[in-house]
């Protein structure tokens, strides 16, 4: 992160209020600390109160300001109560960062009797995020100011195999946000989607092969959010994400072939790799050819 961008970031967030979901670990934890260190009041949302209290204590130890709001973001009534608690605690929210998410790595042919995978992924990644937006948006409209940042996925651009439930939920939020963006433009509210590549967080830990593929660190992912806050673009993607989007737009069959090769190259479970759970040379080469992609 260059010094000029960092200075602009501090200028943009100092004295502001930022609500971050999924703030107890990974990207959410990292960006919460970063925003608090820049002088904002961070509102931390996640399921577990004890973990949130630890994050709050760490932020306050560094001189930052944080408030915690434990909430199950798959429960719509709980989100309504959360929203009421937040607006009773602070009079506005300047930044809403929809970071909380659930990912499922499972091929469609392995999901014939697992419709609940699609339901629970949509419940958190789409319905939970939309419910929170609908609750907070009237206050942003009234103030004619605000930014909503959605942590999406490179899989939305590349059509990642084995992630149909996850990608569909992120794509739904993406489509909702594109429609909303035009509606709130006159109210000076901006909406940014960040198509994150794989990030080394607890969410990807169960997939052991991801130990051996290129990923971003949570700090690098936080840099993208910092850029989003400063520049307020409609979308942010890596070079691979943009290339995947262009390829699918002008040559969808090529995109299909490349994703199919990856689908057949990588196993559905680490058990198929044996006890060492390592990638062979061909798998490593393909993973490096498409850095940050979900396989």
Swiss-Prot record:
For the protein in the UniProt heading, the enzyme class is: oxidoreductase
- PROSITE patterns assigned: ADH_SHORT
User: What SMART domains does the record tag this protein with?
Assistant: PKS_KR
Q: Which UniProt keywords apply?
A: Lipid metabolism, NADP, Oxidoreductase
Reported EC number(s) for this entry are: 1.2.1.n2
Indicate the family of this protein.
Answer: Belongs to the short-chain dehydrogenases/reductases (SDR) family.
Q: What does this protein do?
A: Catalyzes the NADPH-dependent reduction of long chain acyl-CoA (with chain lengths of 14 to 22 carbons) to the corresponding aldehyde.
| Record protein name field | Fatty acyl-CoA reductase
């Amino acid at each position: 992160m260059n010094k000029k961008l960092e200075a602009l970031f501090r200028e943009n967030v100092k004295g502001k209020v930022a609500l971050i979901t999924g703030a107890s670990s990974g990207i959410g934890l990292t960006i919460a600390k970063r925003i608090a260190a820049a002088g904002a009041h961070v509102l931390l949302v996640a399921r577990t109160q004890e973990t949130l209290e630890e994050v709050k204590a760490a932020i306050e130890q560094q001189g930052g300001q944080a408030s915690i709001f434990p909430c199950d973001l798959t429960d719509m009534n709980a989100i309504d109560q959360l929203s009421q608690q937040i607006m009773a605690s602070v009079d506005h929210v300047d930044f809403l960062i929809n970071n909380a998410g659930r990912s499922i790595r499972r091929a469609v042919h392995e999901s014939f009797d697992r419709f609940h995978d699609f339901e629970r992924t949509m419940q958190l990644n789409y319905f939970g995020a939309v419910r929170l937006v609908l609750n907070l948006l009237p206050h942003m409209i009234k103030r004619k100011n605000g930014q909503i940042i959605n942590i999406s996925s490179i899989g939305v651009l590349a059509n990642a195999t084995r992630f149909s439930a996850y990608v569909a939920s992120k794509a739904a939020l993406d489509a909702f946000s594109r429609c909303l963006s035009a509606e709130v433009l006159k109210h000076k509210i901006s909406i940014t989607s960040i198509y994150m590549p794989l990030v080394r967080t607890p969410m990807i830990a169960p997939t052991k092969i991801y130990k051996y593929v290129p990923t971003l660190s949570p700090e690098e992912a936080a840099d993208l959010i910092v850029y989003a806050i400063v520049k307020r673009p409609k979308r942010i993607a890596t070079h691979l994400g943009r290339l995947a989007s262009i390829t699918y737009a002008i040559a969808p069959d090529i995109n299909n072939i490349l994703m199919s090769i990856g689908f057949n190259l990588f196993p559905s479970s680490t058990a198929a790799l044996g006890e060492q759970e390592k990638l062979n040379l061909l798998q490593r080469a393909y993973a490096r050819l498409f850095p940050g992609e979900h396989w």
